[in-house]
């Protein structure tokens, strides 16, 4: 495994560990998810370019579109929760508290 792939895999791992550790606030969870999606995008783009997969050349763009949709939905959820409850704690998203 080359050093570039190792660094991208480490970025994904650090983002995943951050998602597991800092899950009390919604904003930190969204940032970790964005880091994971960015590292997946870079890894997929490099794989497509290095192996000359012509049929899979649209896959990184599709992943980037899904990442943008995820970011938009996450930020709208963050605004809704912060306006409703006054905080961005993930504990407020539990629907069983009603």
UniProtKB/Swiss-Prot annotation:
Keywords, in A-Z order: Electron transport, Membrane, Mitochondrion, Mitochondrion inner membrane, NAD, Respiratory chain, Translocase, Transmembrane, Transmembrane helix, Transport, Ubiquinone
Top EC class, one word: translocase
Cellular-component GO terms for this entry: mitochondrial inner membrane; respiratory chain complex I
Any Pfam family matching the protein: Oxidored_q2
EC code: 7.1.1.2
Plastid listed as a keyword: no
Membrane topology note: Multi-pass membrane protein
Catalytic activity, reaction form: a ubiquinone + NADH + 5 H(+)(in) = a ubiquinol + NAD(+) + 4 H(+)(out)
Residue intervals passing through the bilayer: 1-21, 29-49, 61-81
Subcellular location: Mitochondrion inner membrane
Record Gene3D superfamilies: 1.10.287.3510
Coiled coil: none
UniProt entry tagged with the keyword Transport: yes
Any GO MF annotation of the entry: NADH dehydrogenase (ubiquinone) activity
Subunit note: Core subunit of respiratory chain NADH dehydrogenase (Complex I) which is composed of 45 different subunits.
Sequence similarity: Belongs to the complex I subunit 4L family.
PANTHER family per the UniProt record, alphabetical: NADH-UBIQUINONE OXIDOREDUCTASE CHAIN 4L, NADH-UBIQUINONE OXIDOREDUCTASE SUBUNIT ND4L
The protein's role, per its UniProt record: Core subunit of the mitochondrial membrane respiratory chain NADH dehydrogenase (Complex I) which catalyzes electron transfer from NADH through the respiratory chain, using ubiquinone as an electron acceptor. Part of the enzyme membrane arm which is embedded in the lipid bilayer and involved in proton translocation.
Name of the molecule in the record: NADH-ubiquinone oxidoreductase chain 4L
Organism: Neophoca cinerea
Gene: MT-ND4L
């Amino acid at each position: 495994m080359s050093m570039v792939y190792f660094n991208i895999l480490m970025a994904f791992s650090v983002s995943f560990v951050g998602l597991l550790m800092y899950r009390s606030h919604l904003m930190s969870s969204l940032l970790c998810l964005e880091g994971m999606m960015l590292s997946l995008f870079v890894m997929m783009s490099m794989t497509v370019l290095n192996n000359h997969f012509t049929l899979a050349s649209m896959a990184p763009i599709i992943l980037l579109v899904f990442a943008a949709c995820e970011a938009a939905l996450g930020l709208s959820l963050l605004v809704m929760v912060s306006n409703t409850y006054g905080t961005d704690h993930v504990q407020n998203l539990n629907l069983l508290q009603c």
